[in-house]
A protein has these predicted regions:
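Soluble periplasmic/extracytoplasmic beta-strand elements of cell-envelope proteins
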Residues: 34-36, 89-91, 97-103, 117, ...
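Extracytoplasmic segments of membrane-associated envelope/inner-membrane machinery
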Residues: 100-181, 187-188
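Short, well-structured beta-strand/strand-turn elements
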Residues: 80-96, 168-171
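Extracytoplasmic/luminal low-complexity segments enriched in Pro/Gly and acidic/polar residues
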Residues: 194-235
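Ser/Thr/Pro/Gly-rich low-complexity linker/stalk segments immediately outside membranes or between
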Residues: 24-38
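Periplasmic/extracytosolic POTRA-like scaffold domains at the N-termini of outer-membrane
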Residues: 40-83, 129-154, 159, 191, ...
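Hydrophobic membrane-insertion alpha-helices, especially the h-region
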Residues: 6-23
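Short beta-strands and strand-coil junctions in structured, solvent-facing domains, enriched
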Residues: 86-87, 107-109, 125, 186-187, ...
């Protein structure tokens, strides 16, 4: 029995020593971080080089670091300051290289007066120096409280091939929202930013039924303000 207890004790000491030594080797291992540590090959608004240089400027990473000095939380927190990025995840990969996964926000509407975009959540995205996304444009003054609503309108338009190809831009007279089609002279009076999907669906059904008729060609304004109604005002 004593021999068995002694054997277990020796084994436990060896195991603990091995774990301590392994951990010591890990935290004192050099890791090399470069632009290839950043994972995302489909960026459109910012480059991996820009992200890498931003992290270096913020002292979140260096070209070579001890594992002990790598602060994964700091990397993720600094990346939150890049408004092009929606999510980041920093972790150790196989054999301990640092992996920095990032995902990009997707603009759905361009706010012309303010010179920025909104994504589908209503988050502000700065203009990019490397790309100009083709999204619906909005002209007019916008209350920041309506960012989510106008972003929802933009997202609904950009998610539908008919709306995306049919509408030219959105504008506001500070009271109501209007939409201008690409191929027609009339204006769509959208009204307030409510019942967005329902209003657009009503318009799509109306257009499908009337696109070949004179009522479309003779229209000056198409009113979507009222529930389940499409009212045509002729020239």
């Amino acid at each position: 029995m004593k021999m068995k207890i002694l054997t277990i004790s020796v084994f436990s000491i060896l195991l603990l020593s091995s774990m301590i030594f392994s951990n010591y080797k890990h935290v004192n291992r050099s890791v090399y971080i470069n632009v290839n540590s950043i994972v995302n090959d489909s960026l459109t608004l910012i480059t991996k080089d820009s992200v890498f240089n931003f992290l270096k400027k913020k002292n979140a990473i260096k070209d070579s670091m001890l594992t002990l000095d790598v602060d994964l939380n700091k990397i993720e927190n600094e990346l939150k300051n890049i408004d092009y990025l929606k999510m980041s995840n920093a972790f150790y990969g196989i054999n301990s290289p640092v992996v920095i996964q990032i995902s990009e926000r997707s603009p759905v509407i361009e706010i012309k007066n303010e010179n920025f975009y909104l994504d589908n959540e209503g988050i502000i995205i700065s203009k990019s120096k490397i790309n100009s996304p083709k999204v619906i444009a909005f002209f007019g003054n916008l209350d920041s409280l309506n960012n989510k609503k106008i972003a929802r309108l933009g997202n609904t338009i950009m998610s539908d091939d008919f709306f995306k190809n049919h509408f030219n831009y959105v504008f506001s007279d500070s009271l109501e929202i209007y939409i201008k089609p690409k191929l027609y002279d009339y204006v769509i009076e959208f009204g307030l930013l409510d019942n967005i999907e329902s209003k657009l669906t009503n318009y799509k059904l109306f257009y499908a039924a009337k696109s070949e008729s004179n009522s479309i060609k003779e229209a000056e304004k198409i009113n979507l303000k009222f529930t389940n109604q499409v009212i045509v005002q002729k020239k």
